[in-house]
UniProtKB/Swiss-Prot annotation:
Endpoints of the signal sequence: 1-17
Protein name (database record): Acetylxylan esterase 2
Family per similarity comment: Belongs to the cutinase family. Acetylxylan esterase subfamily.
Glycosylation sites: N207
Molecular functions per Gene Ontology: acetylxylan esterase activity
Lineage: Eukaryota, Fungi, Dikarya, Ascomycota, Pezizomycotina
Organism name: Talaromyces purpureogenus
Length: 234
């Protein structure tokens, strides 16, 4: 009843009225929305991306978030047994579907991407294109719509296996690259929106031998990552 009255009132305002769809978007769409993608074998939800996801939510009251729904697996029975390659392919598709769908519903909402480990890899490919040849993913196109890319204001990747030292957005002590590192000369069209964190002792995003390093980026770089996001959101 109230919604019908509200709509009728708007229509009665004449040509100068704000379009109804625009009003409905303002009533239902947040100013900022965060997508989080978890690491391999993490339980459904945000996994270790939660540090930055929650930081953004706390810094911007009224902002919202959702987790990317994908296997996050590497063949382990605990995550359903999907191979890493299959999980990555499903993850890239899930990122594209979730972000593009949200953007079509809330085209004025600023978007933040936060991916940890495999979660960073799938977001990296979806946003930057270039494919993921080591995992058999040969589609090199950017998977997000141009409208969605425009509204992605910041992207944080932590422990991303596609890390390659020397790219403009790479941060940390790693001077090498991950097991799915980008090829020499790769250029991401959204490079200015990204910070990707990896340290030398990490065996997944770099060539180190300390697996514990891989789980420490939230505490090591969380504040720095949040500051970058804030600088991009304005």
């Amino acid at each position: 009843m109230h919604s019908k009255f509200f709509a009728a009132s708007l229509l009665g305002l004449g040509a100068a009225a704000i379009p109804l769809e625009g009003v409905m978007e303002k009533r239902s769409c947040p100013a900022i929305h965060v997508f989080g993608a978890r690491e391999t074998t993490a339980s459904p939800g945000y996994g270790s991306s939660s540090t930055v996801v929650n930081g953004v939510l706390s810094a911007y009251p009224g902002s919202t978030a959702e987790a990317i729904n994908y296997p996050a697996c590497g063949g382990q029975s605990s995550c359903g047994g999907a191979s890493y390659s299959s999980s990555v392919a499903q993850g890239i598709a899930a990122v594209a579907s979730a972000v593009n769908s949200f953007n079509s519903q809330c085209p004025s909402t600023k978007i933040v991407l936060v991916g940890y480990s495999q979660g960073g890899e799938i977001m990296d490919v979806a946003l930057c294109g270039g494919g993921d040849p080591n995992q058999g993913y040969t589609n090199t196109a950017v998977q997000l719509s141009s409208s969605a890319v425009n509204m992605v204001k910041a992207a944080i990747f932590m422990g991303d296996p596609m890390f390659r030292a020397g790219l403009s957005y790479e941060v940390g002590t790693c001077a090498a690259g991950g097991f799915d590192q980008r090829p020499a000369g790769f250029s991401c069209p959204s490079a200015a929106k990204i910070k990707s964190y990896c340290d030398a002792s990490d065996p997944y995003c770099c060539n180190g031998s300390n697996a514990a390093t891989h789980q420490g980026y939230g505490s090591e770089y969380g504040s720095q990552a949040l500051a970058f996001v804030k600088s991009k959101l304005g």
